[in-house]
Design a protein with these regions (language model features):
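C-terminal region of N-terminal signal peptides and the immediate post-cleavage residues
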Residues: 15-38
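Conserved beta-strand position repeated across blades of beta-propeller domains
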Residues: 44-47, 85, 135, 172-174, ...
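Residue position within the beta-strands of beta-propeller blades
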Residues: 57, 94-95, 143, 183, ...
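Short coil/turn segments at the loop-to-beta-strand junctions that recur within blades
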Residues: 77-82, 126-131, 165-171, 204-209, ...
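Beta-strand-rich domains and repeat architectures in extracellular enzymes and scaffolds
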Residues: 35-64, 76-85
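Asp-box/BNR beta-propeller loop motif
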Residues: 62-74, 107-124, 152-163, 190-201, ...
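Short, solvent-exposed loop/turn segments at conserved positions within beta-propeller repeat blades
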Residues: 101-107, 144-147, 183-184, 221-222
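Short coil/turn segments that connect the beta-strands within blades of beta-propeller domains
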Residues: 51-53, 89-90, 138-139, 178-179, ...
Length: 281
């Protein structure tokens, strides 16, 4: 119960920040409202590509690759890339909105890249769904549609089932059991063991971001504290460190934690959140 009394006001602030971070981009030339090809703005998602070991950042203005201390826009796409997940070597799934001036539907539905974000193809739900969260495990894709609040699932990336309605900051899937999900919500963490059809309180910390790897479950609270669980969220441990800034995106790869903040900073921690280092100057 001690967890539940922490950071409620900060959670509301994070909700407002996430809601304010909408979709923009430009497939053509840069405009005054579009950042340069090396500037991150409104980060929505993070993922490490197994093909090159590099961190990819989904933003308000396309997808960037972080290599060393440099961010480089991948391809010419400047779509507002909201939902984002890496599903395999050079394969990404995403959603969102086209850049201003681009042809096509207002909502991208599910799109896929098989060349590490250089080009994208529409797979399903174009014009119908705007997934602000996408998660993948063992062949199942889960998407949280911002237009309806529906949690949807697909095993072929074409046909979808609506499982429930849930207001979540983030979702994580058990890497061994794709029907087991955790969601971070304003009411606390919630768990589903039937593929998102029903939910129950899961206890635990007042987290906003989640990442579930085969090794452990990692969560970040609204004040930037990193907590970990090695028993499927039954118990949690935390470190003394705290990430600077309001957290908006999280991923973990080979024991390195990557975190993006509302200010557009991307940080890394190799000591479970005890200390954080910026990835760009």
């Amino acid at each position: 119960m001690a967890w539940l009394g922490v950071a409620v006001g900060v959670l509301l602030l994070v909700t407002a920040a996430v809601t304010a971070a909408g979709w923009r981009g430009d497939a053509g030339s840069s405009t005054a409202s579009t950042p340069s090809d090396s500037v991150l703005s409104h980060v929505h998602g993070l993922g490490v590509n197994p093909a090159d070991g590099q961190l990819y950042v989904a933003t308000h203005h396309g997808v960037f690759r972080l290599s060393g201390a440099q961010a480089t826009r991948v391809g010419n796409g400047r779509q507002d890339t909201m939902g984002f997940t890496v599903t395999g070597p050079d394969e990404f799934l995403a959603s969102g909105h086209p850049a201003p001036g681009e042809d096509g539907p207002r909502h991208l539905g599910l799109i896929r890249s098989t060349d590490a974000g250089r080009t994208w193809q529409s797979l399903s739900l174009a014009g119908q769904a705007d997934f602000h969260l996408l998660r993948f495990s063992r062949g199942v894709v889960y998407g949280l549609d911002s237009t309806s609040g529906a949690l949807m699932a697909s095993s072929d990336r074409v046909s979808w089932q609506t499982r429930s309605t849930v207001e979540a900051y983030d979702l994580a899937i058990d890497p061994h059991r794709p029907d087991t999900l955790l969601a971070t919500t304003e009411q606390g963490m919630r768990r589903s063991t039937d593929g998102g059809r029903t939910w129950e309180p899961a206890g635990g910390p007042p987290a906003v971001l989640l990442h579930w790897s085969p090794r452990e479950l990692v969560a970040v609270t609204a004040d930037g504290t990193l907590v970990r669980s090695v028993d499927g969220a039954a118990t949690w441990s935390s470190t003394a460190g705290r990430a600077p800034g309001a957290p908006v995106a999280l991923t973990v790869h080979e024991n390195v934690v990557y975190l993006a903040t509302e200010e557009g900073r991307v940080l890394r921690s190799a000591d479970a959140g005890a200390t954080w280092q910026p990835m760009m100057p």
